[in-house]
Amino acid sequence: MDSIVLYTEEIDDLEEAVGELFTQADTFALKKNTLAVLFAEEDTDYPELYKLLSARWDFPIIGSTTMAMLLAEQGCCRTGISILLLTADDCAFAVGMTDDLNKDHYREEITNLCASLQKELPTPPKLVLTYGGMVASEENVPGDEVVSVIEATLGKDIPVYGGIASDGFSFNNYRVFCGDRTTQSGQAIALVSGNIDPIFITTNSVENRADVTYEVTKAQSNKVMRLGTGTFIDALRRENMEVSKQNVVGDYFLSPFVLSIDLGDGDISEITRTLSLLNLETGTGVFLGEVPEGSILRIGILNRKDVQKSVEQAFGEILETLSRSDGKRRTLLCHSCAARFLAMASNTKAEAETYQSCLPEAFSLLGMYGNGEFCPLRGEKTGKNHNFFHNFTFTIMAI
C-alpha cells in the first residue's frame, strides 16, 4: 500500500486550501482503490471542503475534527487540514457511517453497517478503521460498546483502530466525517481487505498515582454508581474533588482513574479512564470508557515527563519492529489522547519532536489528538492482541 500525507494551514479560504492539497498530491500515483483519512480543526467548514475535494476525488473520505495534528515534517499543528491518502491495487475499502447512536439502538446500527460494508468487499476484512464522538451525555455510547458490537459482527480476530473526535477543549464542537456527512454521535467505519497486515503499538502515559483506592461495588458499562459503601460522588467529595456540576470532563482531564481489567484468555492489563459526567441526583459517575464492577480505582497523575517517555517508548518499539520486518510497511497512523497534549503545557511540540528525530524519510505519518483511542492491546501473558478502547494512551498503527 502506498501513501502520502497532505497538509494546509488554510481553513478560511477553502478553495485556496483545496488547491494546495491537490498540488501536493499531483505527483502521487493513485492506484485502483484509495481511501482518504482527514483531520481538521473544529472551525473547518467540512461540507464545503468535501464538496470541493469530491469535485476531483471520487474515493471515500473518513475522519474527524481534532484539537491538534501530528505530521512528519510540520510536527504538531493546532490549525489546518491534514489528509492521509492510502492507495493500493491489492486492497479494497468499504466505508460508511451510522445514524446518531444512543443506548437504545446502537447495536442494531453498528451491526447493520458492518454487515453491509462487509458485503461490499471482495474478500474478508483484515482491518477496521473507525471514528466516533465522545460520551457527552448518559445516552452516548462508550467506545468499549462499539468495539464489542464490531467484534460480534465481524469476529474478534480483525483489529479495530481509530479514535474519538476532539475540539479545542470546548467538548461540544467536535465532529465525525464520512463522505458528505457529519455527526457528533454517529460512528464512521472503514473496512479494509486484501494485502494488509498492520502492526500496532500502545503505550500508557500514567505512571504516578495517589495512595487512595476504591473498590467499584456497583457499575454498568461506563457508569459507576457506588465505590465501597457510598456513591461515586460521595467518594469524590471525600477527596475534595469537583462534584458541583454535571459536565466535568475538563475538570478531570489531567486526573485519570487507573484500574486493572481482564482482557480474556488470562491477560490482565492496567488501563486508565476519563471521567466525563456526574449525575448529581443519583451520585453516579459516567466515564468515557467502561469501568467494570469489582475493579479497584486509583487516581492517577498525568505529567509531562511520563508523556514524553511513553512517546519515546512507542516509536522506539515500532521502528525496531519494522526494522525486522519485510520493509513494506511505510505508513504510520497515530492517535494520542488530548489530555497528553494538555499535560505538555507550553511544550506542546514535544511529542512531535520525539519522532521527528528518528523517523526514516520514506515513511508517511499522520496523527491526531482525540478523546479516546481504539487500538489492539497485546496481552502480557499470551502475546495475543485484544481489541480495546483506551484513554490517556499513545497508539501507532503501521501499514
Question: What kind of region is each of these model predictions?
Answer:
Residues 1-35, 40-60, 64-332, 337-345, ...:
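Small-residue-enriched flexible segments
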